[in-house]
Amino acid sequence: MGRNKKASFNYIKERVWKKLQGWKEKLLSHAGREILIKAVVQAIPTYTMSYFKLPLGLCSEIESLIRRFWWGQKGDRRKVHWVKWETLCLPKKEGGMGFKDLANFNDALLAKQAWRLLHNKDSLFYKVFKMKFFPNCSIWEAQESSTGSHAWNSILKGRDVLLKGARWRIGCGEDVIIWNDAWLPSLENPRVLSDIVPGFEDGRVSDLINPLT
């Protein structure tokens, strides 16, 4: 995949546009538009977003097409958008319509792929990616690469989503680094905030545990 990722994925926007163009002239209620947006339009990019991080600009352009369709805009005649798109993406119980925020949905799908790598270590999927992209560390420590595939770098975006909420559950503590890993039982900040002790940069939580107690 070349540097211009937006051009590589532009076919998704074109498919969405063609779908919406076919419906614009029809007299649809808001209930009808809601069903079409959720069941058809927002389903179009789902497969691709499961494996690749789409450019934010492309997501915004697709959402712009959907917004105009939702408010009944035809051609160049602009119509007032009475509610912000962010509000429409909220659950209905919170005053929204339950539409998908495409960028957030993309991140969630990629996080699912990262979760597969973490929990299916006997799979061919894991073995191939492990050997090629993180042979000497875990996926938690793996780094994005300018020479790596876009699929791999996309999975790392999903990994970063998991990192925001992931916590180590301490057993023996041999694999948990004191200073870098999230292991403290705190909801606000699970990482150690004090300065790193010189000479103990790679200290493990197991070093803090007295085996006799």
Regions found by a protein language model. Give the residues of each.
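A helix-boundary/hinge signal
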Residues: M1-T213
